[in-house]
């Protein structure tokens, strides 16, 4: 498989009802599989996914391992060239995967990438969490493209060109599976 889109869930049936449809509708590519990794939810998330989206594969974890622990355990169950860790509250748009897959296929030296994230409240502005990748300034202070402190920029196309960043957001993180595991996965403490 080329790409596994993995959505970590814990008691998030309402988020899945709201956002999973766009992921399913706009991720119809060859060699792409969508997974919901469930962190031992007690709501009816699993039942809803099974009945509403039978082609979405479920990975059922035995307890709530949190973000990093949940992804690490779920990804061990998946064989794929790339993983795309996607928050359950992300709405994707048509053709969102093609630039990510194309870039990673052309740049074997790149371990991970992310799409541009726009705000759900105002799609002309960047999302506060992650926006367009992160940096560390010369004083060691972290900041994101698209946001400085509490000021979020309007999207005027200024970040449409790929750029090497210090980190990519976990809200929509595409990573080469071999590099994910060579790095030891995510730190389970987070």
Model-identified regions with their sequence ranges:
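Short, acidic, metal-binding catalytic loop of nucleotide-sugar glycosyltransferases
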Residues: 21-31
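Conserved donor NDP-sugar-binding/catalytic core segment of glycosyltransferases
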Residues: 91-141
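A conserved acidic beta->alpha catalytic loop
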Residues: 13, 22, 38-47, 63
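Short aromatic/hydrophobic "clamp" motif used to bind/position activated sugar donors
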Residues: 83
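Short beta-strand/loop segment that forms part of the nucleotide-sugar
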Residues: 31-40, 59-61
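A recurrent flexible, glycine/aromatic-enriched loop bordering the glycosyltransferase active site
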Residues: 138-144, 149-178, 182, 189-190
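Cell-envelope/extracellular polymer assembly enzymes that use nucleotide-activated donors
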Residues: 2-4, 33
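Glycine-rich, basic loop-to-helix element that forms the pyrophosphate-binding segment
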Residues: 60-78, 88
């Amino acid at each position: 498989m080329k790409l596994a889109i993995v959505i970590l869930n814990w008691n998030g049936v309402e988020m899945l009802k709201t956002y999973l449809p766009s992921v399913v509708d706009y991720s119809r590519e060859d060699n792409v599989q969508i997974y919901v990794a469930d962190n031992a939810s007690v709501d009816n998330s699993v039942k809803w996914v099974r009945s509403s989206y039978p082609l979405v594969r479920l990975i059922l974890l035995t307890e709530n391992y949190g973000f990093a622990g949940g992804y690490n355990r779920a990804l061990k169950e998946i064989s794929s060239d790339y993983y795309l860790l996607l928050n359950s509250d992300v709405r994707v748009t048509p053709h969102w995967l093609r630039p990510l897959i194309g870039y990673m296929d052309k740049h074997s030296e790149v371990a991970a990438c992310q799409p541009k994230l726009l705000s759900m409240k105002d799609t002309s502005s960047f999302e506060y969490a992650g926006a367009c990748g992160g940096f560390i300034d010369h004083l060691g202070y972290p900041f994101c493209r698209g946001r400085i402190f509490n000021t979020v920029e309007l999207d005027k196309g200024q970040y449409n060109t790929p750029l090497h960043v210090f980190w990519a957001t976990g809200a929509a993180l595409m990573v080469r599976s071999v590099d994910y595991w060579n790095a030891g996965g995510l730190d389970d403490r987070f």
